[in-house]
């Protein structure tokens, strides 16, 4: 329980810091912290696979992409001094609507099982607790993915192969005019002689 | 599981393996200093053609399993998929025959595009035999990913890059819409398998305002929109002319031939087999009318060949959707006949477009006095154009005749009427080709290079078929009837 509060507080604080941080690089780093804490929360909920995927996808790919973009864009820190309160009404309304929607959704039954009305007297109890055969998410997913859905798994691997080929085809130039980095020459450069001060 | 499934999937497995071996071969040898960086396009092209032909053979010889659900109900094979796959592979093979010479003339040394064409062919095979929403979506995604890359494959041309980017962005939207529809269907029914969906939807009336779930209605609507996007039916056709014009001509040929077969086959499976219901019929009805009208009117203003062919393919999609929106066995049969003849005519036209080149055959006016310089080619092109327009003894007339007949048979008189009117209008721009070839005297006379032998064979076969189809059409009718029965029973 203590762990839960630690994760929640850290996630909320760093979520606020994402918005408040002056330096965009810092705010991306805080975003990564938010993701890490949220995946901790997911582990506490028993969703181990989700936690893993969350880390891999969001931290491993998306946040790093953001970091690259932020570094490339080269934003001056001094230029960002806007009034935060300007965005408060719009953001607040959107946030309130979101909260309301969540409260509407919680405890709702989306799909009625049958359109006809059943009287409850027919129903008898089944003790499901005795029938539970406990598997973790990872085991279940592995079992399904490599047996029942192996075809889909293979087709998705082909999709990744096409993405790979496509990226190479569209970006690699085979002509001689292209400037290319030769790793050996790059490593063999003498650092003393590369930059000189001209008087 | 293993002995049956792998036996039945042997053609697909062979094609994937051959593609990957070709890829490795190309990568290893095109970067080898020892052989002085050879351009492998022609080499890989011939090998790819060979592997497609072997795949046709493997499919055609057939496994001992005629009807089966494969890999845990993810795929199905029956008569419908059997003939569709053979037909698809034949059309891919004809595209590859056309591209052998093209890459050499354009000096486009990208053997990867042949590998990508092979991979997309493979995905289209899966798409034809898909029997599950997830398998269907993955196959469509694999196909479109290959297409985005080969649309942009001519990197030094701005048109090609633009076409690739445009196709990518719009295609991503349509895939998203399709996936959203699939997830709605899954959310409201709990199944993704086509057979189970068909069982759920028998006798289940999907109405928007009725007591039943509107989520299913929305799901079907979204899936239909996604599909219509992919086959360039009218409200969702915006990308087609630009993409068709911008991509390299061989890629345009591939785009307007192969995916039409696979996506229509998949649509038939989804809508006729699984969601058989009058609600989507109105949507296809509307799209069919709109595509026919736009295909006829917008093509008149074009003076570039590829753009005109793009609009003509939009119009033909409209005619094919007539058969689709009937929903009867005759409708499906006429659709299948229609797509078969459409593909043959399109192969023919693109072979001619690729054969005519001084620098590039881009504008229609470049055809001037072709009847003097190359009379045989002129006759071929005019036969195909007459067939596109639907002049009686040719094959194009038969396909249109059966489509309109099916529309009349199910009481959709409006569809048949608009179809006849628009095909009369579209006669104008098809016959304009003939007029330019025979009666116009150009300012500068152009002589075209002689075409290669592969293309001439292709032209001869397709023209022979288009001209003499009316003498002996019964095999095609029997085959398509069997395919239609396979879906409906």
From Swiss-Prot, chain A:
Disulfide bonds: none annotated. Its EC number is 7.1.1.2. Keywords: Electron transport, Membrane, Mitochondrion, NAD, Respiratory chain, Translocase, Transmembrane, Transmembrane helix, Transport, Ubiquinone. It is an enzyme of class 7 (translocase). It catalyses: a ubiquinone + NADH + 5 H(+)(in) = a ubiquinol + NAD(+) + 4 H(+)(out). GO terms for molecular function: NADH dehydrogenase (ubiquinone) activity. The chain crosses the membrane at residues 1-21, 27-47, 49-69, 87-107, 150-170. GO terms for cellular component: mitochondrial membrane. It is found in: Mitochondrion membrane. It comes from the Eukaryota. It holds the Pfam family Oxidored_q3. Its main location: mitochondrion. It is a multi-pass membrane protein. NCBIfam families: PRK06638.1-4. Belongs to the complex I subunit 6 family. Core subunit of the mitochondrial membrane respiratory chain NADH dehydrogenase (Complex I) that is believed to belong to the minimal assembly required for catalysis. Complex I functions in the transfer of electrons from NADH to the respiratory chain. The immediate electron acceptor for the enzyme is believed to be ubiquinone. This is NADH-ubiquinone oxidoreductase chain 6. It comes from Marchantia polymorpha (Common liverwort).
UniProtKB/Swiss-Prot annotation, chain B:
InterPro entries: NADH-Q_OxRdtase_suN/2, ND/Mrp_TM. GO terms for molecular function: NADH dehydrogenase (ubiquinone) activity. Its EC number is 7.1.1.2. One of its GO terms (cellular component) is mitochondrial inner membrane. It holds the Pfam family Proton_antipo_M. It is found in: Mitochondrion inner membrane. The chain crosses the membrane at residues 9-29, 47-67, 80-100, 114-134, 168-188, 216-236, 248-268, 280-300, 309-329, 335-355, 376-396, 401-421, 459-479. It is a multi-pass membrane protein. One of its GO terms (biological process) is ATP synthesis coupled electron transport. Keywords: Electron transport, Membrane, Mitochondrion, Mitochondrion inner membrane, NAD, Respiratory chain, Translocase, Transmembrane, Transmembrane helix, Transport, Ubiquinone. It catalyses: a ubiquinone + NADH + 5 H(+)(in) = a ubiquinol + NAD(+) + 4 H(+)(out). It comes from the Eukaryota. NCBIfam families: NDH_I_N (TIGR01770). Belongs to the complex I subunit 2 family. HAMAP family: NDH1_NuoN_1. Core subunit of the mitochondrial membrane respiratory chain NADH dehydrogenase (Complex I) that is believed to belong to the minimal assembly required for catalysis. Complex I functions in the transfer of electrons from NADH to the respiratory chain. The immediate electron acceptor for the enzyme is believed to be ubiquinone. This is NADH-ubiquinone oxidoreductase chain 2. The gene is ND2.
